[in-house]
Amino acid sequence: MRLLVINPNTTQAMTDAIGEGARAAAGTGTEIDAVSPPWGPASIEGHAEEALAATAVLDVIARQGDDYDGIAIACYGDPGLYAAREISKVPVVGIAEASMLLACTVAHRFSVVTVIDRVVPMLEDVVARYGLRERCASVRGTPLAVLDIERDPTAASRMVLEESRRAIAEDRAEAICLGCAGMGTLECEVRDGLDGVPVIDGVAAAVKMLEGLVGLGLGTSRRAAFMEPGPKELTGSEPFLEALRGRIPAPSAVR
């Protein structure tokens, strides 16, 4: 099977690292392509950046998505996930949802350890969106900006490990979800520093979930929430809108 892993930011080095992690998690016979949108923010640490990135994700899916058996959105806010499911013909998985659902199978309660504190309320909203407030012990920030992880992975591992230990000791977390796609490179060191506590990388979780969905022949439900878009006039000539017109039929096309 072929899987498309979309890093919603435009930092190529991060996309390359995400791709390596996805390939390491993939089973035999699974081909991974990791891509970034051609436009958008260099990193995602706020609502405005997330909104831009969500639109860029839809752009990538509209142009490339039909060439794959499944799609992963590799940012922990899962930007554009629900909209992506509407326009995609194949299953779409977000790394946050995948990792949290996996955490719920190996632990009673989990904590998310993420980047700067500004992101914490955003991820608390994500937890609530997925109906997991009772299973989430906490969302904890660190001093790390997203792009700091690659610049100094040793310091990043230390900060994530320290905050994970606090989540276990103070919040009674039983599993740790790494709350940034770039943290996959830290998984082994963080896991080795915790005693018997599962550490879940969202990129790996999303790849395995997609492999399962594709293997079982399961696609996105077209009842209610994720129905394909109905006929709608799209105004403008931007390239993104041109790509999206192939997914959202014009009213005249369905008369």
Model regions and ranges:
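Glycine/small-residue-rich loop that forms an oxyanion/phosphate-binding "nest" at active or ligand-binding sites
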Residues: 54-108, 112-113
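Active-site rim beta-loop-alpha module in soluble metabolic enzymes
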Residues: 124-181, 187-189
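C-terminal alpha-helical cap/extension of soluble enzyme domains
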Residues: 2, 21, 27-49, 67-68, ...
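Short hydrophobic/aromatic-enriched beta-strand-loop microsegments
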Residues: 90-97, 134-139, 196-203, 220
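Short, structured coil segments at secondary-structure junctions
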Residues: 28, 87-90, 106, 135, ...
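N-terminal glycine-rich anion-binding loop in soluble enzyme alpha/beta folds
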Residues: 1-56, 115-152, 250-251
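Short, glycine-/small-residue-rich phosphate/pyrophosphate-handling segment
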Residues: 13, 104-142, 155-158, 212-255
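Glycine-rich, highly charged phosphate/nucleotide-binding loops
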Residues: 46-66, 155-163
